[in-house]
Amino acid sequence: MGRGRGFKLRAVSIAALAAGALAVAHTQTPAETAPAAATPPAQPAADVQHGKAVTYTCLGCHGIEGYKNAYPMYSVPELRGQNAEYLAIALHGYRDGDRAHITMHSQTETLSDQDMADAAAFLAGKPLVSSGKAAGTPPQAAQLCVSCHGPDGVAVAPIYPSLAGQHEDYIVRALDEYKHGGRKNLVMKQFASNLSDADIAAVAAYFSRLTPALETEPRPYTRLGE
């Protein structure tokens, strides 16, 4: 499939979006605010049924509860309840090289913008609804996270990922990639570079235990016609 022209993600700085943000800061205080995110380009209207067909192979990993893949081994992310707009942005990142992941690049390199919008809508399902309440006090390293990802881990805007109930080891891996350049996002690199391994572990542990939680996308069919 050819790439669509309506969504020129690479023309917009991923750093400005903070779209892949697992927004964390160690040296900043809770009173400080997160960097403002630019408004991303409009995405195509989604066709969920087409998204179901597009994601047929995706569920080979994302449809198995607790499944781990890639090297080093870590859990593939929970997608059910995630923001579809964020998922589409993430897919663009894998396709266009802003996220280094061989498997995900191979899965997305032939997808058009429309394909990714459709796939994201199907995989996300109904987004999580925020309770508006924090579960205890976030660790110091995560104080700034809640400004984008919510006090209960439910993102405050659809361009950000919700983190509530996400696999702990996946959050650790994502932060490590932002810190070391596996994900090209200058805003997140700035945040993650200030975190020690212990800080990253604390952030991941906190968000992974929050509810309402993301879930594994179910695999309701084995053939495209079902």
Language-model segment annotations:
Residues M1-A45, H92, D96, R209-L214, ...:
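N-terminal export/targeting leaders of redox proteins
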Residues G60, G125, I159, D197, ...:
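Tandem repeat domain/solenoid detector
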Residues I64, D96-G97, G125-V129, P151, ...:
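Generic structural signal for alpha-helix termini and adjacent loop/cap motifs
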Residues E65-Y94, H105-E109, L144-V146, G153-K179, ...:
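Gly/Gly-Pro-rich "capping" loops immediately C-terminal to redox-active cysteine motifs
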Residues H101, D118-A121, N185, D197-A198, ...:
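Interaction-mediating elements
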